[in-house]
Amino acid sequence: MVTDFVLQTHPEPGNVVHYEYALAFGSQSEMAPYYTAWQNLISKPDLDRRFGSIFIMMPLGALVVGDFYGTEAEFEASGIPGWLPKGEHRHIVLTDWLGSLANSAQNEGLYLTNLPAPFYAKSLAFRREDLPSPEKIDRLFRWVDMQHKGTPLWFIIFDATGGAIGDVPGNATAFAHRDKILYYQSYAVGLPLLKASKDFITNFHGQVLEACPTAFGTYPGYVDPALVEPQRQYWDANLPELERVKKVWDPMDRFHNPGSVLVK
């Protein structure tokens, strides 16, 4: 099989600002105002596209991390630092393109281990109009406080997206989530992985759906064996066209996984 890849490239950025804000809390409910402020920032329609950010909820606090592709002066002039939480531990690294890649590689290296670790995960994608209100965020974070997690190794990642990816029409490629500006992924890790941990992740997802009833879909590749209608969740409105292509080019379904497009 021969496949052509057509890529549109851009010059590498000259400067990169990597930032980390560590926030310590005694309870998840204390974290809600900080998450609300972060959500307000990443959902701004005129947000500088050079900015990327992740909010990570953890048992003892939160971590806000990301990159700004520009100089420190441009980062400050954007007004973004004024929206970010004023954590006790603030860490800013000024680097270049290669340095930012090395930093990302170093962070990825921290995840590598020779010990297999069972985990359970859920995820969901949000358009701007799907995002929860401050009141619903407060209720959601208070709910987390009251739950038995079954493991100390759990975390919930809120990952800002959008920007130039949304300039491409939604039906131009297989990727259907160009109107989304946020993904969340929740994880529980355990040796062994207890039912209580799975229940916590599953029920948190249910609480999110209750707070954001119009949110639908998730990023292709976020594997979830319990996902309802995975093909529709992954490919959304593009699924009929992908089913047509699948029928022509892979009628025997040789390229198959539980979430892949099926032959119809």
What spans do the regions from the language model cover?
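Soluble FAD-dependent oxygen oxidases
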Residues: 1-264
